[in-house]
Amino acid sequence: MKAEIISVGTELLLGDILNTNAQYLSKKLAELGIFLYRQTVVGDNMDRILQAFDEAFKRSELVITTGGLGPTQDDLTKEAAAKFFSKKLVLHKPTLQAIKDYFKGREEYLTEGNLKQAYIPEGAIVLDNFYGTAPGCIIEDSGKILIILPGPPKEMEPMFETAVMPYLMKLQNCVLYSKVLRVFGMGECLVVEKIKEIIENQDNPTIAPYAKEGEVLLRITARADNKELAEGMIAPIEKQIREKLGEYIYGVGEESLEEIVVNLLRKTGLTISTAESCTGGLVASKIVNVAGVSKVFMEGIIAYSNEAKVKRLGVKKETLSKFGAVSEETAIEMASGIAKSAGTDIGLSITGIAGPTGGTPEKPVGLVYLGLYVNGKTAVKKLQLGGDRNKIRNRAAMFALDFVRRALLPLV
């Protein structure tokens, strides 16, 4: 099946809005094995939308539109679709009621334009919008399929996932199953380079890398007659990827780094405490977000000043004087100090310069040291992180959790 995407909206032509819908739909169609032939952007103009429909259906059986479903006079996608297929626009009473319910208890007022949104091309399959007032619809006519979706991504994406995806899967007569591998400590470019050969040889399953907040997600998607067959197709691809990336893969699906660390602590029967400076308690906060953590996490201290490092963690004044607060030596003493003070098997420390001030040529902004104490043995990790203050702090916290994860893996 060949498909085309028509993005409707003058604001897209003018560059006022980034067309993320087309990117999203392209990836989803690829996952389904539907060949995307062309993407078109057209303004809010009846004749141009009709021309886009005519040209697209000469090339493809499936056309998906986004946008042009709003309450204003220049929102014309449904009107154009009705005219193209010689259909009437008819009132869809369940949609009308849903729109009225949407405005109950809101400061916004129901307008004539909103009522217009309840009219649907006659005979179309209505797609409910649970996040706005503009329903989508599917028109099937003489071997042609037109899927009309709202423009706002927060409305379009859930509609596609819950209604359009199952519809297209049924057309394709297949089950679509995905597995996500979570990677930390390696950038997207390097991840792609490492598994380049696997990606180049992909067909079914497909592999899609995504960078997300300091980590990389690898989505492996298979099409098959049933879930069991799809899982069997994914397994050898996952094995190849794991052989290439090793311990950089920390989890699967929705697992977070902190959940993995807490689970490893439970399996090993070890306890942990944290001593943080530049991250200001972020690591401890992430750990305690995991339910049932009280059996493995004992204590977290924010020792921001040198005085606190000496008084609360037992860092030597001589160490601070000779090497400074941001140093390997201080990080190790912080980790050892918190472990001994809290009586835990593991002590984790972070000290660094989050910026935007405080950096020097010798110790620039973004310099971070992680200290780790595990039953008498110590280790340290040096990081040089980029970005603003919040990004540095968040990335440092994630690297700290990963530092603990890697130390625990051989003990399980």
Curated annotation (Swiss-Prot):
Query: One short Pfam family name for this protein?
Result: CinA_KH
Family matches, as InterPro entries: CinA (IPR050101), CinA-like_C (IPR036653), CinA_C (IPR008136), CinA_KH (IPR041424), Competence-induced_CinA (IPR008135), MoaB/Mog-like_dom_sf (IPR036425), MoaB/Mog_dom (IPR001453)
The record's annotation in SUPFAM superfamilies points to: CinA-like, Molybdenum cofactor biosynthesis proteins
Q: Which CDD domains match?
A: cinA
| Family membership noted in the UniProt record | Belongs to the CinA family.
- Check the record and name the NCBIfam families matching this protein: cinA_nterm, molyb_syn, PncC_domain, PRK00549.1
Protein name as annotated? CinA-like protein
Q: Which organism is it from?
A: Kosmotoga olearia (strain ATCC BAA-1733 / DSM 21960 / TBF 19.5.1)
